[in-house]
Curated annotation (Swiss-Prot):
Main location: membrane
Protein name in the entry: Odorant receptor 88a
CC per GO annotation: dendrite membrane; plasma membrane
Membrane topology recorded in Swiss-Prot or TrEMBL: Multi-pass membrane protein
Topological domain ranges for the Extracellular compartment: 48-52, 164-191, 299-303, 392-401
Tissues where this protein is expressed: Expressed in olfactory sensory neurons in the antenna.
Length: 401
């Protein structure tokens, strides 16, 4: 359904659609289906997770063995630090998706239950705007992944086909897609180049699919929470305290429903943060390290093809780190909007009972919902500047040594 063609109510599945490359590669880690018994959302298959686990164990097992051999036995290192760091970054997010898969399915069902089923109520909640934002972002990710991804994968292949000097010459690191180490020297053997490149392509597709799935779930969940908080804030603004003087019993019945909904949304915000907090803590700092390596690589080369290959993941790291921090700020502001709506009321015109309740309610609303990780970080724009500063410090350290 296009955002300009509002003909029927939106369904949760429309926000959770995978990208085309994920479907072609059979890397849709959450295959959302409706349970015919209770109409709940379920993940129909675990096969993509199993395939991804096999690829990750093989890739990191081989590279881990090579790293151990380098530090303990003094063997030459075969790693490509920028690529290895971003594969770790993607795989951490994939591991989080697997470990939190039950919580993710449960949370999606929580959001699905809160979404109204009729179009009029959805428009009142401004779900059309939420879907429009999702659709614009989905198209951007589709263009970027289906153009930038193939370019990143094809550049090493083109370098090998155009510049490799012969079958007796080992494959150089810049001619490999991911680099690293594989048994029996097959990674550096030109006779096995296409086989190794195909394996790297599968690992790359797996990692990008992890990243896209994580990104879409994070943003869809955040968009729905902001939508619900905004709708509740408008309901707060519509409260007329003077009605507590005419029909106090009915007034407090309606008020109780609003407070219960606020408590429900606060609980959903906490569950949302619990799902992603470990990924925030680990992957953001790994992302800073990855960004440092990419900046170092770009500053040390003058090859146009290599610059073109590595500029894309650099922009991805900066852009998506910025967006995650921006989403945290947006959620915090949406939560603060509840308190702002209350403070704009003419509460002093209400009954004595309401005035007492209003003071307690205002104190409760001051507890804004924030994204963070174990009290160590707060995911907002300040955190984005901290990550960029950390990446710059690491970059200057590498340049000085």
């Amino acid at each position: 359904m296009k955002p300009t063609e509002i003909k029927k109510p939106y369904r949760m599945e429309e926000f959770l659609r995978p990208q085309m490359f994920q479907e072609v590669a059979q890397m849709v880690h959450f295959q959302w289906r409706r349970n015919p018994v209770d109409n709940s959302m379920v993940n129909a298959s675990m096969v993509p997770f199993c395939l991804s686990a096999f690829l990750n164990v093989l890739f990191f097992g081989c590279n881990g063995w090579d790293i151990i051999g380098h530090f303990w036995l003094g063997h030459p290192a075969n790693q490509n630090p920028p690529v290895l760091s971003i594969t770790i970054y993607f795989s951490i997010r994939g591991l989080m998706l697997y470990l939190k898969r039950k919580e993710i399915v449960e949370f999606v069902n929580d959001l699905d239950r809160e979404c109204p089923r009729d179009l009029v109520s959805q428009l009142d909640m401004q779900m059309d705007e939420t879907y429009r934002n999702f659709w614009q972002r989905y198209r951007f990710i589709r263009i970027y992944s289906h153009l930038g991804g193939p370019m990143f994968c094809v550049v090493p292949l083109a370098l090998f086909l155009l510049t490799h000097e012969g079958k007796d010459t080992p494959v150089a690191q810049h001619e490999q897609l991911l680099g690293g180490w594989l048994p029996c020297g097959v990674r550096k053997d030109p006779n096995f180049y296409l086989l190794v490149w195909s394996f790297d392509l599968m690992c790359t597709t797996c990692g990008v699919s992890f990243f896209v799935t994580f990104d879409n779930l994070f943003n869809v969940m955040q968009g729905h929470l902001v939508m619900h908080l905004g709708h509740l804030a408008r309901q707060f603004s519509a409260i007329d305290p003077r009605q507590s003087l005419t029909d106090e019993k009915r007034f407090f019945v309606d008020l109780r429903l609003l407070v219960q909904r606020q408590q429900l949304l606060n609980g959903l915000c906490r569950k949302y943060n619990d799902i992603f907090k470990v990924a925030f803590l680990v992957s953001n700092f790994v992302g800073a390290g990855s960004l440092c390596f990419y900046l170092f690589m770009l500053s040390e080369t003058s090859d146009v093809l290599i610059i073109a290959q590595y500029i894309l993941p650099t922009l991805v790291l900066v852009g998506f780190t910025f967006e995650i921090c921006l989403r945290g700020t947006q959620l915090e502001k949406a939560s603060e909007g509840l308190e702002s709506s209350l403070r704009s009321q003419e509460w002093y015109l209400g009954s004595r009972r309401y005035r007492k309740f209003y003071l307690l309610w205002t104190q409760y609303c001051q507890r804004t919902q924030q994204l963070g990780a174990f009290g160590l970080i707060q995911v907002n724009m300040v955190h984005f500047t901290e990550i960029m500063q950390l990446a710059y410090r690491l970059f200057t350290f590498l340049k000085s040594h």
